[in-house]
């Protein structure tokens, strides 16, 4: 799931993420009696083709960005502006989190939605 970020106006996207988190909670309750853990991972911003297109659109619409590459625009506008750690997440970051949830080390964790987003959701 994408990162949970206040101020975003993409209602269908955010509602679907909220539904998955609620579904995670409900499944954890229902499946716990069978010793099944259910958790969700909420990734932050990961450089993808969609982000490339968004960055390219920003460059096209803003002359001040013409000297920047799409990745540089992404890093400035999507990563540094939104995350206290100032770095985007990688597929490996998400994979490590999923591997943790699949391991015995997380045997007492269920019904959680873990944000792996560089602190983007801190209040």
Stretches found by the model and what they are:
Residues 32, 37, 109-111:
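Short, small/polar-rich loop/turn modules that mediate ligand/substrate recognition or access, typified
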Residues 37-43, 47, 102, 115-117:
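Conserved SDR Rossmann-fold cofactor-binding beta-strand/turn motif
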């Amino acid at each position: 799931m994408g990162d949970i970020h206040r101020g975003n106006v993409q209602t269908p996207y955010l509602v679907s993420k909220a539904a998955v988190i609620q579904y995670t909670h409900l499944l954890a309750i229902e499946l716990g009696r069978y010793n099944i853990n259910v958790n969700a991972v909420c990734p932050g911003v990961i450089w993808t083709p969609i982000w490339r297109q968004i960055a390219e659109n920003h460059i096209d619409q803003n002359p001040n960005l013409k000297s920047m590459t799409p990745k540089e625009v992404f890093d400035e506008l999507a990563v540094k502006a939104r995350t206290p750690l100032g770095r985007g997440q990688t597929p490996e970051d998400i994979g490590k989190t999923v591997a943790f949830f699949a391991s015995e080390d997380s045997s007492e964790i269920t019904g959680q939605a873990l944000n792996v987003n560089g602190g983007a959701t801190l209040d």
